């Protein structure tokens, strides 16, 4: 519409008085215009753009409103910047109070010049058929601070509809902010509307603060999970005690001195309504820590400045301190994952959730099928759903149901528990075997454990065989020496031959050399002995290499079998001396027993049993006074390669009839 008209600046400079032209030229010259921070240097550098307003009919176009709201109005050209009017919210027309200091006139306009400018504006109004906005002189007082508001350009229809809606509060507010009020009411309304919209913008710092609060809660959720609710108890509720105190410290001192340290033998909590139900603790310090649940004592306080956290358990304080130091000692054990955590519970939770779908922690409450990836979630579930009284301890877990797949750190404990259960299952067999042997032997002192410890002999070979002995499958297992040890050396392996044993046994404790001998009066006949000799003599060559510590060849001579039934004679017949000093601990009665054994070798009714009554010993007691696996007398060497006691010997068998003990 106005594209064909010449610029306002050209018209003002061509038609006007000398004074007015001089003053206008001062403001419109390129030198003065360069004072403003506008991208356009002179008015001639850019042509006036055609107005682009929302689609309206020609009859309804209000040129005055269009010019006032247009950013390309005359005043905008004089200021040479559309941003100045837009930033101040004046939408193209000048309001002296809204002009920022950067875009104000360099010096105030005197009244004479102001009247000349008004005259020029009236001449322009006759040419265009409307009255342009009046130019207000700039204020003489120092310019106020520039108010930053968001530029909003609503359509003109909205401006006209809101032009008459001005409240008293908004007018008073604008009058206090602006030194020179605007001549147009929609201007004040628009400024108020812009400020209202600015104030009504969504507040972003609030969600940010909530997010920080969530992070803080996540940081402290694990360190407080085992801490009970805040309790401050000053009265003693111990069983039979009703003392009252003023402070918590006095109550704690009373409990520790009078109740806990007073009962040194058993560590039981006798507090009223305690969910532990007087189950004893293993140590005193555990009871001291437990009592903090009742008293509310939290002696472990955070040492960082400004932090008032306190905990009843030292472990929880250490975990909390990592939130200050940033320490994360628990690294994910999965290959390729370098994530670290401040506590083990978070690491277990991460590993089970991220690297596997395993939920090994099962709720033990009957009827509940909940499973969790970490122990802290299970404890929280039990406490919140089933109540604090439903807490399941480690000891109770073994009694109710088989435990879930254990953690890695508990694997060794589980294995040891299983092994001990196996030993307990084998012990009844050993007990039954011992009962079946009561007609053959009587034991005075038993200090041995269920399993016999296998120790190495001086030759480097074990004195207890870990291989299955073929003696268990023979028909005549009447030896008093052969003892097959499987792994742990259970006594149940002796069942095959001890029930038919016509010998006198000796029991040797692991710490003491105690020999208790009771000879059986009723022995088997010589015929049975001769039969055993014939059956066992065939393999004795391969099992006699242990007589001397030095290795011997296969041409070792067998001891001769005498006609009187004694098979314990050595071919040399020379007496041997016991080099072990622990043999000095034998009592006089035991020496007498040994003499009786030597006398029974001449008897035709004696058996081979008496020769080995003191020889069944572990090599840990004496390497020279140990049991023979395949003796020359019993000759139970069905194994060609017997690995038992290859470097030890029996002083009874090697000494022959003239067995001497040098004291």
From Swiss-Prot:
Major localization class: nucleus
GO molecular function, one term: DNA-binding transcription factor activity, RNA polymerase II-specific
Keywords from the UniProt entry: Activator, Cell projection, Cilium, Cytoplasm, Developmental protein, DNA-binding, Metal-binding, Nucleus, Repeat, Repressor, Transcription, Transcription regulation, Zinc, Zinc-finger
Chain ranges passing through the membrane: none
Mapped zinc finger ranges (C2H2-type): 234-259, 267-294, 300-324, 330-355, 361-386
Biased composition (Low complexity): 160-182, 456-473
One GO cellular component term noted in the UniProt record for this chain: cilium
Domain of life: Eukaryota
Cited PANTHER family: TRANSCRIPTIONAL ACTIVATOR CUBITUS INTERRUPTUS, ZINC FINGER PROTEIN GLI2
Family of the protein in this entry: Belongs to the GLI C2H2-type zinc-finger protein family.
Main function: Functions as a transcription regulator in the hedgehog (Hh) pathway. Functions as a transcriptional activator. May also function as transcriptional repressor. Binds to the DNA sequence 5'-GAACCACCCA-3'. Is involved in the smoothened (SHH) signaling pathway. Required for normal skeleton development.
Protein's name according to its UniProt entry: Zinc finger protein GLI2
Organism lineage string: Eukaryota, Metazoa, Chordata, Craniata, Vertebrata
Gene from which the chain derives: GLI2
